[in-house]
């Protein structure tokens, strides 16, 4: 597995992030900057040792109208015989629509990714991803739905189509949020995708917000799990592209976020992801730790 980390591997969608504002902006624009890093150790792999990634992201929102985000990442995948280095860039724009016929906000969003690396096979280099999404969040912020699509263009004629319907529900007086997302992924050539013609997976995330009485108590906690299989996936919430052809067979994660000031937060997360390389009949795990520091003004 090699993925490009982005906004945060454990955030909810941009719409549900509005449930807890990071800070009050002094003007019409609200700016948020993220610095993040990830380190993972592989277990059970005969070819991989570890992977690390660092990234920065800047997001700007104009009043309640919409906004944009720009980010970049650098990734190092340490094989037992070599090292792969990768650069990724990310851009996103969204527009909020307020229609009289709808009891909430309709959001149109477009993401783009470009990934380059020194893969000697050339199969994961110069990857382009286009990912539109339409979402709805009611005014009570207790119901969310979206439909996302991603088209990924790989070298050697491979393309990957992905459809991701999502449902989110708030409950317990807005202290809890449950989100479910289905991943339907279809590569154009099974021979370039571990002899897999399509994959289906269900991703679930539960978030609980606390009312911390001290800085040591988390502001919120996230628990996530992935069931089923997916390959060449594009994660819109995490702004991540899984651009090496191993089949992900599930994952589990735990994350906590602390509020360290009126406009600054720290998130720490850990998890385990399982993968299968069918070509060499090998199943292995990636155990990772993730840190995200964000500030807003």
Give each language-model segment a name.
Residues 15-24:
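C-terminal segment of classical bacterial N-terminal signal peptides
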Residues 9-11, 15, 256:
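Short, functionally important structural connectors and interaction interfaces within domains
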Residues 1-10:
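Bacterial N-terminal signal peptides that target proteins for export
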Residues 25-297:
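Transmembrane beta-barrel domains of bacterial outer-membrane proteins
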């Amino acid at each position: 597995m090699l993925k490009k980390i982005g906004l945060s591997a454990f955030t909810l969608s941009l719409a549900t992030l509005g449930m807890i504002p990071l800070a009050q902006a002094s003007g019409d624009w609200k700016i948020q900057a993220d610095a993040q890093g990830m380190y993972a150790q592989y277990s059970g792999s005969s070819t991989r040792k570890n992977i690390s990634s660092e990234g920065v992201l800047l997001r700007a929102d104009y009043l309640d109208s919409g906004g944009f985000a720009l980010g970049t990442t650098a990734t190092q995948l340490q094989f037992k015989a070599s090292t792969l280095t990768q650069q990724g860039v990310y851009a996103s724009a969204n527009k909020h629509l307020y229609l009289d016929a709808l009891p909430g906000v309709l959001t149109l969003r477009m993401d783009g990714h470009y990934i380059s690396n020194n893969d000697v096979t050339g199969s994961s280099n110069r990857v382009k991803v286009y990912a539109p999404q339409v979402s709805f969040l009611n005014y009570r912020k207790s119901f969310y739905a979206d439909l996302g699509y991603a088209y990924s263009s790989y070298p050697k004629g491979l393309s990957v189509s992905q459809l991701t319907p999502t449902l989110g529900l708030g409950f317990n007086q807005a202290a809890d949020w449950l989100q479910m997302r289905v991943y339907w992924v279809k590569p154009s050539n099974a021979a370039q995708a571990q002899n897999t013609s399509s994959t289906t997976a269900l991703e679930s995330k539960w978030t609980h917000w606390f009312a911390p009485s001290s800085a040591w108590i988390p502001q919120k906690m996230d628990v996530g799990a992935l069931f089923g299989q997916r390959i060449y996936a594009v994660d819109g919430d995490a702004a991540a592209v899984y651009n090496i052809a191993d089949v992900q067979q599930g994952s589990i994660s735990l994350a906590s976020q602390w509020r360290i000031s009126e406009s600054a937060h720290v998130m720490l997360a850990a998890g385990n992801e399982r993968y299968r390389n069918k070509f060499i009949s090998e199943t292995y795990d990636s155990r990772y730790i993730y840190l995200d520091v964000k500030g807003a003004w």
